[in-house]
Curated annotation (Swiss-Prot):
Probably involved in intron recognition and spliceosome assembly. The splicing pattern of the pre-mRNA is regulated in a tissue-specific manner and by development, and changes in response to various types of abiotic stresses. Residues 207-243 have a biased composition (Basic residues). Signal peptide: none annotated. The modification Phosphoserine is found at residues 201, 203, 225, 231, 233, 242, 250, 259, 263. One of its GO terms (molecular function) is RNA binding. This is Serine/arginine-rich splicing factor SR34B. GO terms for cellular component: nuclear speck; spliceosomal complex. Component of the spliceosome. It comes from Arabidopsis thaliana (Mouse-ear cress). Residues 81-121, 192-263 are annotated as: Disordered. PANTHER family: RNA RECOGNITION MOTIF RRM DOMAIN CONTAINING PROTEIN, SERINE_ARGININE (SR)-TYPE SHUTTLING MRNA BINDING PROTEIN NPL3.
Length: 278
């Protein structure tokens, strides 16, 4: 189990009249809250320590609430006990590379949410390119309790994977819906995850394309060899030309083909023979 310090966050710049219930409402969406220690000094702002069951939920809360505008107060959220972790660090712990994904958005970039998984999984297609795993998680919570979210991008667009904690929540979420974040909104499609359809890895797809290219190469080489043999054949040339041209050109082509196997003297003899005929 993770240490308490990694599961507890500090929340600063709270309004002086905030209540503990309001603090819980702010952070319970990121995971089960164990304890809230709210401090309201004589002179505001106030602050609080919020402990989660899981350190990954604490990271979620830092990412989602650091800088959040609550009733005109921009909250400051970081790890407690001197273990400062900014919202930028929290993003890195999940996406690894920010919104751009791997290599600045090369089509295979991925952004991950918490690593807890379940068998009650749905696929969300048609997401806007600006969607993050946190945006997806927040949106899909309308269907039930989400324990995992992931966003990845490929040549077909932006797709999400969401795991629910129960079968009922997963079934409730299976419906087309309108996805919104700070940048855009799209109508997305939600369907149940199919292991046979959705578990193909990118590396498997790449190896398949290579094998197909290897399969084509022999046919290309055979077609080239056939074209060369036809172009060198005197008979092939004579079939494509008129009779008048074939009588004047075919002897010369035959003499050249024979000249490769005969000595220079023999070639002259053959050449004179044809000249005499002409």
């Amino acid at each position: 189990m993770s240490s308490r310090s990694s599961r507890t966050i500090y929340v600063g710049n709270l309004p002086g009249d905030i209540r503990e219930r309001e603090v819980e409402d702010l952070f319970s969406k990121y995971g089960p809250v164990v304890q809230i220690d709210l401090k309201i000094p004589p002179r505001p702002p106030g602050y609080a320590f919020v402990e989660f069951e899981d350190a990954r939920d604490a990271d979620d809360a830092i990412y989602g609430r650091d800088g959040y505008d609550f009733d005109g107060h921009h909250l400051r959220v970081e790890l407690a006990h001197g273990g400062r972790r900014s919202s930028h660090d929290a993003r890195g712990s999940y996406s690894g590379r920010g919104r751009g994904g791997r290599g600045g958005g090369d089509g295979g970039g991925r952004e991950r949410g918490p690593s807890r998984r379940s068998e009650y999984r749905v696929v969300v297609s048609g997401l806007p390119s600006s969607a993050s795993w946190q945006d997806l998680k927040d949106h899909m919570r309308k269907g039930g309790e989400v324990c995992f979210s992931q966003v990845f991008r490929d040549g077909r667009g932006t797709t999400g994977i969401v795991d629910y904690t129960s079968y009922e929540d997963m079934k409730y979420a299976l419906d087309d819906t309108e996805f919104r974040n700070a940048f855009s909104h799209e109508y997305v499609r939600v369907r149940e995850y199919d292991s046979r359809r959705d578990s193909r890895s990118p590396s498997r797809g790449r190896s398949y394309s290579k094998s197909r290219s290897r399969g084509r190469s022999p046919s290309r080489s055979r077609s080239r060899s056939r074209s060369r043999s036809k172009s060198r054949s005197p008979k092939a040339k004579s079939l494509r030309r008129s009779p008048a041209k074939s009588t004047s050109r075919s002897p010369r082509s035959r003499s050249r083909s024979k000249s490769r196997s005969l000595s220079p003297r023999g070639w002259v003899t053959v050449e004179r023979h044809w000249i005499a005929l002409i």
